[in-house]
Amino acid sequence: KRLHQESFAFEPASIDALFLSHAHLDHSGLFPLLVHGGFSGRIYCTHGSAKLLPVMLNDAAGLYERDLKFENRRRQRKGKEILDPIYTKKDVETALGLCYPVSYRQALPIGKAGKASLTFYDAGHILGSAITEISFTEEGRTKKLVFSGDLGKQRRRHDSFLCRWQNPGNSFSPGPA
């Protein structure tokens, strides 16, 4: 029900790209809805996430279709308006076709004229999970935007990476690698 009542606060067609931290549905589940709304950019993800997404999104779409069919039968019995699907399995297939898998620690030029770069690092959460680093130059200075959806418990996977950003050039980290 909630999906039919809410809408995005932006136009999905205005988005140039998506960066997926990992394939769990709370991070990827609305991709088909974004596609249905006009998104057609790249979905950057790791190879592991690209392999999990078909299972996750198709399963979610199947559950959504089943629940919608049940809800529409209930609505029909009460004389209420039937709900149209807000996305379809075709939207899932389109979203999957927009996925652009990137290897861990591979700097990939992105954006107009490749003026930014994307690098994924293993987040240790699930297969394919990533800490995402986007580097770009602004006013002659290189800047880095780093984010992650979830981090795993194995400290060794991300401590040295995070240490660089908290204390660049300290005794634990001689500076950016």
Task: Give the location of each predicted region.
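An acidic- and aromatic-residue-enriched active-site/binding cleft used to recognize and process polar
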Residues: G48-S49, A123, R164-W165
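Pre-active-site segment of Zn-dependent metallo-hydrolases
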Residues: K1-G41, C45-A95, C99, L151-R157
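Cationic, amphipathic, low-complexity alpha-helical segments enriched
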Residues: Q154, F161-Q166, F172-A177
